[in-house]
Amino acid sequence: MSIPAVAPAPSLPRRLLRGLRLFAATALLALGGTAAAENLSTVASGSLAPLPAGADQPQLLVVDGRDVVLSAGKAWALASDGKAWQPLTLAPAGATADVRMAVNAGGQTWLLRGTADGSDRLQGVRLQGDSLALGRTLALPVALGQAQVAALGDVLYVAGTGADGSMRLYRHALAAEAGGWQAQPAWPAPGPLVALQGQKNGLYAVIGDATGDALWRWTVDQGWRQAPEPEGHILPGSLRALGQAHLLMLVRDAGATRLRTFHTITSAWATLDAPATAAAPAPLAIVARGTGLAWAGADGGVHYAEVQGGKHLLGWLDWSVIVIYLVGMIGIGVYFYLKDQTASESEFFVGGRSIPFWAAGISLYATNTSSISFIAIPAKAFETNWQYLTNNLVAVLGLMFVAVWIVPLLRRLDLMSVFSYLETRFHPAIRMLASALAIAMQVGSRLSVILFLPALAIATITGIDVVWSILIMGVFTIIYTVMGGMRAVVWTDFVQVFVKMGGAIFAIGFIVWTLGADFDGIREAAMAEHKTKLLDFSFDLTKATVWGFIFLVVFDVVLTFPKDQVLMQRTLATKSDKEAGRSIWIFAAIMIPGGFIFYSIGTALWMYYKHNPGRLDPLLPIDATFPLFIAAELPPGVTGLIIAGIFAAAMSTLSSIINSVATLLSVDFYDKLAKNPTERGSVRFAEIMTVVVGLAGMGLALVLSRYDIHSLFDVSIELAGLLGGGFAGAYTLGMFTRRANSPGVAIGIAGSIALTLLAWSFDLVHPYFYLGISILLCIVIGYLASLCFPAPARSLKGLTIYRQDAT
């Protein structure tokens, strides 16, 4: 009798994946089309003190943070209580009678002044007590009629009509010591100039027309291009920049006046609720004030409207999901603490060299995809395109070389600190110098940024102050890292990869479902705006090009992969050199699909906010776009799940950095400098340093929270290049040459750091090049300097990639 075949029971991973698919499909079916259409931002309006007597033709401006009225050669400043205008003394008297408008640039206010022939100069002005003092004058090349002035960073732009009636545009860089005014191409459209404004690396000009104004945008890459029309007439003087990517203005059509925003990334318009005072006859004067506008009415009143963002508090279900995740991470730390209470150095630093290669590979990816991947990369793709993804594609090719040649070589040496190699190959001083620079780079350029980004997300979503968010994140990470050592770090990484990738995939699916389109529709719309542009083969060194990424990967991955203790420590924790190489293959296999997921989030967000511009908060930084979407658009429970993903993205890298830096401090410094170091003392010192390093990262993150930084992704790249490239070239000199020696390497490290700082101070190239340049300089200078000293006398067996030195 034959026995019918019975299908084997699905494996646990398959059951989990099947459950996740069922959950996602059910959630999307239940939640599709639930996104609200109303604006997230509100408008607060009110009135200031009425215009002072005698201010019949007023000019409103803000000087050094105070509201000022100019009229007929007189000036007044608003009192601190906002109830009256106080007269100001002019120096010289009556000097402001010919002011046409004002703009703030370079840390001060500039007045556009002129005569009956037109505007002919800009002049700085400051408040000094109760006096309004005039300063530096910038004479225009020619007098301009209908002139408008704008600022883009510390660059002034002035536009208007020349004597022949043609439109003129001039720029002046305030920071430049020479150069003066430079003529620029004006927009190719007829009509009077209504307004001029700078925002997000672009200049915007409003051109008047009887049927409705036109908006033109200028950027370095594309020149002048017409943007979508505002559907009405923009009131002169009302155009202003708001936040990092919005324009705010008063638009009038069919007798109604609306407060409107234009998002410079999606080129989409949104309408806010304008106060009734804005619907009165045309204001006498308008000025950018706070987060909105202020205007003087014909009735003598001074009114204002300010844009306000909101906080999106988490519900009990969201907090429950987050708490379960955090408790789970602490639980893993407690488990390994109880299991290995008498941990040796090998157990605490490299997990007893018993970590499976597949777990090490997943941990490598988790560590490499921090909160920068989860928050800043979607923001970068949302703002620009996919060009930075080229780095992932090229890096995979570099990792193939690393898996075959570099990692097995170092794993055979049974290191705990990868900088021990530099001592064996060169000198103990080289090891300690390189280790110190690596510690500074990890704490300064990575730990602080990676901790700050999720804190920003939490603050955006919950309303909890960024300071408290940083403290909570840092403390939880420190606890499970100090308790469980390397084993806890690797296995929490393993869990965190699935948490954050699941949240990322769900977010993309939710956006596609909500828009009522499939991935092909989103891809086609995004490609029409070049949002998925991936490859740039130009030779412009100020841009992120293919050649730049190849240059970076050759020096950052192929030649100097061992410089990163955080990544190398996982390969050193595997059972053998073969398993160490396999962990790199796993890492490379995950990197490309993972990169596409995070860049797809940015493109999906662009499509969502292109169709729903009112759901953006103009006051939030671009880096907060994905956290805002999570908070405002996703339903309870799912929001908590993806917030847990943000936590996972940050904590996996934070714990890895903290553990690795503590390892370096213990192995490279404590064991070398202590009088009678013991194995138990080394582990105890590492535990203490885990806490100290975590607290230091928290402190630097608190400092970052006090600054308005446009893109933390770029900041992280820049700092890593300045701090991390100098010592990295030492590995290239050690593994790929047999002639390099310790004096030459020391000179190479010092010279590369000095020259890279020089390139940074003059802003010569794109920040992505700093790391590669620093490494290249270290290699070239170090090798040439080595030729001036005797060749190494010690054996190089097992220390280079060459066959004659193989073990």
What are these regions (language model features)?
Residues 309-318, 379-392, 451-468, 488-496, ...:
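Transmembrane helix-loop boundary segments of multi-pass membrane transporters
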Residues 274, 279-312:
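Blade-level signature of beta-propeller repeat domains, shared across WD40, Kelch, NHL, RCC1
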Residues 352-355, 376-390, 423, 498-639, ...:
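Loop-to-helix junctions at membrane interfaces in multi-pass transport proteins
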Residues 54-60, 95-103, 142-150, 190-198, ...:
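Repeated scaffold domains used in trafficking and secretory/extracellular systems
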Residues 390-481, 552-560, 648-656:
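Helix-loop-helix module between adjacent transmembrane segments
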